[in-house]
């Protein structure tokens, strides 16, 4: 029998906790036998004194097991259960293509996603833009769509990781969100509760990233890879670039359109293609669908080019209550903003740098993102045709198109976009799309 205050005292004094002590504390979070004040104190003690890898693994497993852990054995799936998670960015529409692409190659992707907050967009918000699509289906429907389509992208259900829900809301109010140990456990407890065979983690780096520096992003990526593998799930983390908008657009309905154009081959933004392929190929290798990256990329290009990935996307949309002809007639079902107008630069030269976070906040200003949880969204607004770094810019060539509902919103977003994209006479240094892979063997 342990006492919550003794566990807090031990961590306050910089000592390592045992797995049993951590399990006891997590149980207390779930059953409310540990008070809000004690959870806040524990969070602050971890923030200042950190946790070693064994502690992080114990915290992740304890939180994962605080609710239902999905099990896919009874469905008789003939492929691996695989998934991807991103730390979030601007124009990060990868999940919408990656899930169907991996499923079309023989994987099963039960993707439990979140909504956007602050400057980062949320995968669920993009699906909420689709008429009829259920982001909170029954567990029976979720399982049915995973089995039949190979992929289902939904929101977190109430019975998954209740400990994280309570802990996170307290961390949010007590300034302990930025702890790598606690971020690792929060992300992974949710992902591993989906009963995965393998996971690929996309950790963003740059001006639109969640972490403030490359070093912090790398530390988080290493922590996630070590803890997930330590908890028994094959995992690789990729560090990818978020120094500019990833797709050609940012918003909700506009990103759904870009995903469809990508899947059908209408248009594939080269940077988006590189990051999507890098993540998806790693999923196939970890899941045993491909022997190596070259074979994985060949399989992925095949399902893109023969239309199978697009077909899977359509099947998932229809299976979760959306239109049956969504791929062919998406413009009938997606909302459109009243004002769609270009924004021009006052300078000529090259797009030299981008404050990606500010561009994400411009989407929030338009009504396409949240300032606080629970805010209602306008799914039609956003940015499209955003220029890429290194692109030649003249005063008569738009740096982006703004989709707004009112003239005032347009003007506010126009100012934000102009301020966020810096034009200079010289070309910027080219950044890689993928900085590095952190695999189990690298730990």
From Swiss-Prot:
Coiled coil: none annotated. GO terms for biological process: pyrimidine nucleobase metabolic process; thymidine metabolic process. Gene3D superfamilies: Nucleoside phosphorylase/phosphoribosyltransferase catalytic domain, Pyrimidine nucleoside phosphorylase-like, C-terminal domain, Transferase, Pyrimidine Nucleoside Phosphorylase, Chain C. GO terms for cellular component: cytosol. Pathway: Pyrimidine metabolism; dTMP biosynthesis via salvage pathway; dTMP from thymine: step 1/2. It catalyses: thymidine + phosphate = 2-deoxy-alpha-D-ribose 1-phosphate + thymine. Keywords: Glycosyltransferase, Transferase. Its EC number is 2.4.2.4. GO terms for molecular function: 1,4-alpha-oligoglucan phosphorylase activity; thymidine phosphorylase activity. It holds the Pfam family Glycos_trans_3N. InterPro entries: Glycosyl_Trfase_fam3, Glycosyl_Trfase_fam3_N_dom, Glycosyl_Trfase_fam3_N_dom_sf, Nuc_phospho_transferase, PYNP-like_C_sf, PYNP_C, Pyrmidine_PPas_bac/euk, Pyrmidine_PPase_CS. It comes from the Bacteria. The enzymes which catalyze the reversible phosphorolysis of pyrimidine nucleosides are involved in the degradation of these compounds and in their utilization as carbon and energy sources, or in the rescue of pyrimidine bases for nucleotide synthesis. Belongs to the thymidine/pyrimidine-nucleoside phosphorylase family. Homodimer. This is Thymidine phosphorylase. It comes from Shewanella denitrificans (strain OS217 / ATCC BAA-1090 / DSM 15013). The gene is deoA.
